[in-house]
């Protein structure tokens, strides 16, 4: 019995997988791999060479999920698709081509250690056991039902390289039994226990930094997780870089401060708990592999020297977050959220400060009043100075899309493109606010960041200038990402809450829907429902929204790098008419109700009477939040009724201040 198979493979575990398929009698129609990266330290076998030696067609496409490649694979008519250490996720349309299923070999005991670099992460975390798992592939990475697992013991002497060898052997053993059983239809699949799932992101050379305030055991685990052939654990010594290749833990630190050299022979460094003996290492990236004592001599270390980085004993430097548009709805709430966390320092710029007055005295909040189109030198300096940049400046009120389309383009695209280019120039992480508007008139039930088409109307419908300006900038950022820009795009879905707008903005029509409706209630004018008010939206509480955004800034294990993330509440879907009816109900029950005129009723009007002829509306806009759940461990919790109540209360109290001001002037 044979089965036509398409394989996605890389690394020598990819080679082990291909060899196991051949040994088990599978007919491999094609193999997809990755081209060799000259910047990468290649210590593993070549999938391409193995395929060439066995007469198997091999390809290395930039994007195997491209429709052209999916069409070619469909013509192969595979029974199975296998993935062995292939680095990219395979799309659902591609996986669906396998008549009998698509399966992946993952280097951990799932559901633990899903994601990238599991062999390195288990060592970093001091695990004593790992393994390999063969599982069915589904849309979500590493989440499908388990077919087989092979356990691997981790010895204290193991490094990432030795553990990788063990995993390669375990993979061959597992596949030797599982693949024939699969051909014979003798496998059973066990769903993963999601309550035990953990997810880890990719590791970078910067993750190898030694922080001497940490326990020696933790540093020992880091050293063996990133030792050769990986870039190594490191710290600064004067103007030099000390790379540690081999180390061991010694009990006690002689009462010395973290980072203090206790002795040079052996080279022993005090840690936050116990001490670390450096057996071997090198000076700088191009240095020789040396013993610890010789390394100490080369670096000019003596007993009592203090390694740079020992200042980490006072705690790591705070992350500096630059928020442009800090006085806006998202900016002021996000600043408040970040300032509750000692790890962050916030720098902000905006043309006003009324919404952030409550934050101005905070010692970790630094504000300058200014315009992004004018204060370019200040902005460039602070992008260079800060770690994370959030350009939140935009025109985002629908009437302006038709009333001032060129101004929308100039601010939302041109000015923000300058900010993105500064981030590219200074290699800074940018978290950019895309918008749910980019999905336009998409007909999908749930709008998916990675799958849904972005559909807009004809050119004469100018309301789409905001959507396409944002979409174009999304695409520019994505292209810069391919050249090294660290970015995350987030798409808010109808966030609401206190300080959303000002009632004055609603008076000139330049506000969001709920503010306009509240103004109608406050002034005793009819609530206008455009085109019947049947358009549905998913309303998200600002507290839920900024919590998700704060987690993007946290970026645990770098899981948000290069991602697009919808942030919305699909359970809070309601029409604009339903929004107005709930507002009215809460308005009538509010303690301040008696201060305002009687309700003037609902009135149906054509949208073009308010927005102009260039307007088009969207019937529904519901997000898929699978990415947010998976990457951020985030689920919205605030019900729409509560959000409406909080928003209404804020604006009614603001309206009361307006009512009281004239009498105050007269009293003077």
From Swiss-Prot:
EC number: 2.1.2.13, 1.1.1.305
Active site as annotated: 106, 437, 621
Cross-referenced CDD domains: Arna_FMT_C, Arna_like_SDR_e
GO cellular component: membrane
One GO-annotated biological process of the protein: response to antibiotic
Single Gene Ontology MF annotation: UDP-4-amino-4-deoxy-L-arabinose formyltransferase activity
Associated pathway: Nucleotide-sugar biosynthesis; UDP-4-deoxy-4-formamido-beta-L-arabinose biosynthesis; UDP-4-deoxy-4-formamido-beta-L-arabinose from UDP-alpha-D-glucuronate: step 1/3; Nucleotide-sugar biosynthesis; UDP-4-deoxy-4-formamido-beta-L-arabinose biosynthesis; UDP-4-deoxy-4-formamido-beta-L-arabinose from UDP-alpha-D-glucuronate: step 3/3; Bacterial outer membrane biogenesis; lipopolysaccharide biosynthesis
Catalytic activity reported: UDP-alpha-D-glucuronate + NAD(+) = UDP-beta-L-threo-pentopyranos-4-ulose + CO2 + NADH; UDP-4-amino-4-deoxy-beta-L-arabinose + (6R)-10-formyltetrahydrofolate = UDP-4-deoxy-4-formamido-beta-L-arabinose + (6S)-5,6,7,8-tetrahydrofolate + H(+)
Pfam families xrefs: Epimerase, Formyl_trans_C, Formyl_trans_N
Residues under site feature: Raises pKa of active site His: 142
Region spans: Dehydrogenase ArnADH: 317-668
Positions of UDP-alpha-D-glucuronate binding: 396, 401, 435-436, 463, 494, 528-537, 615
Keywords per UniProt: Antibiotic resistance, Lipid A biosynthesis, Lipid biosynthesis, Lipid metabolism, Lipopolysaccharide biosynthesis, Multifunctional enzyme, NAD, Oxidoreductase, Transferase
Tree of life domain: Bacteria
Entries under Gene3D superfamilies matching the protein: 3.40.50.12230, NAD(P)-binding Rossmann-like Domain
Signal peptide: none
Region (Formyltransferase ArnAFT): 1-307
Binding site for (6R)-10-formyltetrahydrofolate: 116, 138-142
Coiled-coil annotated residue ranges, if any: none
Family recorded in the similarity comment: In the N-terminal section; belongs to the Fmt family. UDP-L-Ara4N formyltransferase subfamily. In the C-terminal section; belongs to the NAD(P)-dependent epimerase/dehydratase family. UDP-glucuronic acid decarboxylase subfamily.
PANTHER family for this protein: BIFUNCTIONAL POLYMYXIN RESISTANCE PROTEIN ARNA, UDP-D-APIOSE_UDP-D-XYLOSE SYNTHASE 2
HAMAP family cross-referenced by the UniProt entry: ArnA
Function: Bifunctional enzyme that catalyzes the oxidative decarboxylation of UDP-glucuronic acid (UDP-GlcUA) to UDP-4-keto-arabinose (UDP-Ara4O) and the addition of a formyl group to UDP-4-amino-4-deoxy-L-arabinose (UDP-L-Ara4N) to form UDP-L-4-formamido-arabinose (UDP-L-Ara4FN). The modified arabinose is attached to lipid A and is required for resistance to polymyxin and cationic antimicrobial peptides.
Quaternary state and interactors: Homohexamer, formed by a dimer of trimers.
Protein name: Bifunctional polymyxin resistance protein ArnA
Native organism: Pseudomonas fluorescens (strain Pf0-1)
């Amino acid at each position: 019995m044979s089965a036509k198979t398409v394989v996605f493979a890389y690394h020598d575990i990819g080679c082990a997988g291909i060899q196991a398929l051949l040994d088990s009698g599978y007919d491999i129609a094609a193999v997809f791999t990755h081209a060799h990266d000259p910047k990468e330290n290649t210590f593993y076998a070549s999938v391409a060479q193995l395929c060439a030696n066995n007469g198997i067609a091999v390809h290395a496409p930039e994007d195997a999920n491209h429709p052209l490649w999916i069409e070619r694979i469909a013509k192969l008519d595979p029974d199975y698709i296998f993935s062995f250490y292939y680095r990219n996720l395979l799309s659902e349309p591609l996986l669906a081509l396998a008549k009998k299923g698509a399966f992946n070999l993952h280097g951990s005991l799932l559901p633990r250690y899903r994601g990238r670099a599991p062999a390195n992460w288990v060592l970093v975390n001091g695990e004593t056991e790992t393994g390999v798992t063969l599982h069915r592939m589904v849309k979500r990475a590493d989440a499908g039902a388990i077919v087989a697992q092979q356990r691997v013991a981790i010895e204290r002497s193991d490094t990432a390289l030795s553990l990788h060898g063990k995993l390669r052997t375990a993979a061959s053993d597992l596949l030797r039994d599982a693949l024939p059983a699969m051909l014979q239809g003798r496998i059973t699949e066990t769903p993963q226990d999601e309550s035990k799932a953990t997810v880890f992101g990719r590791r970078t050379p910067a993750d190898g930094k030694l922080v001497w305030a940490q326990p020696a055991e933790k540093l020992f685990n880091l050293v063996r997780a990133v030792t050769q052939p990986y870039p190594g654990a490191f710290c600064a010594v004067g103007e030099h870089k000390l790379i540690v290749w081999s180390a061991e833990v010694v009990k006690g630190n002689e009462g010395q401060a973290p980072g203090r050299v206790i002795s040079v022979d052996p080279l022993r460094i005090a840690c936050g708990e116990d001490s670390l003996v450096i057996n071997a290492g090198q000076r700088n990236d191009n240095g020789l592999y040396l013993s610890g004592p010789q390394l100490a001599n080369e670096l000019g270390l003596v007993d009592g020297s203090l390694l740079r980085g020992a200042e980490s004993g006072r705690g790591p430097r705070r992350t500096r977050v630059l928020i442009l548009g800090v006085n806006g709805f998202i900016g002021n709430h996000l600043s408040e959220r970040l300032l509750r966390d000692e790890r962050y320092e916030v720098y902000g710029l905006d043309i006003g400060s009324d919404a952030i007055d409550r934050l101005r005295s905070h010692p970790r909040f630094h504000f300058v009043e200014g315009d992004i189109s004018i204060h370019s030198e200040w902005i460039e300096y602070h992008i260079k100075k800060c770690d994370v940049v959030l350009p939140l400046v935009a025109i985002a009120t629908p009437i302006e899309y038709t009333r001032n389309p060129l101004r929308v383009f100039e601010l939302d695209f041109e000015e923000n493109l300058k900010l993105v280019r500064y981030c590219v120039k200074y290699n800074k992480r940018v978290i950019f606010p895309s918008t749910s508007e980019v999905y336009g008139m998409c007909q999908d039930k749930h709008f998916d960041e990675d799958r849904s088409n972005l559909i807009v109307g004809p050119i004469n419908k100018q309301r789409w200038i905001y959507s396409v300006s944002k979409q174009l900038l999304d695409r520019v950022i994505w292209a810069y990402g391919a050249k090294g820009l660290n970015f995350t795009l987030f798409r808010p879905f109808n966030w609401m809450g206190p300080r959303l707008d000002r009632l004055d903005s609603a008076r000139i029509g330049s506000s969001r829907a709920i503010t306009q409706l509240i103004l109608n209630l406050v002034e005793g004018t009819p609530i206008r429902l455009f085109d019947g008010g049947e358009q549905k939206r998913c309303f998200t509480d600002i507290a839920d929204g900024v919590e998700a955004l704060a987690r993007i800034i946290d970026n645990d294990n770098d899981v948000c790098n290069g991602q697009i993330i919808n942030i919305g509440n699909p359970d809070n879907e309601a029409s604009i008419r339903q929004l107005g009816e709930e507002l009215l109900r809460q308005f009538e029950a509010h303690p301040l109700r008696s201060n305002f005129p009687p309700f003037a009723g609902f009135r149906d009007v054509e949208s073009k009477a308010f927005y102009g002829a260039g307007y088009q509306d969207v019937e529904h806009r519901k997000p898929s939040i699978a990415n947010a759940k998976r990457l951020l461990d985030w689920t919205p919790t605030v019900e729409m009724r509560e959000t409406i109540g909080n928003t209404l209360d804020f604006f009614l109290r603001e309206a009361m201040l307006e009512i009281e001001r004239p009498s105050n002037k007269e009293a003077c």
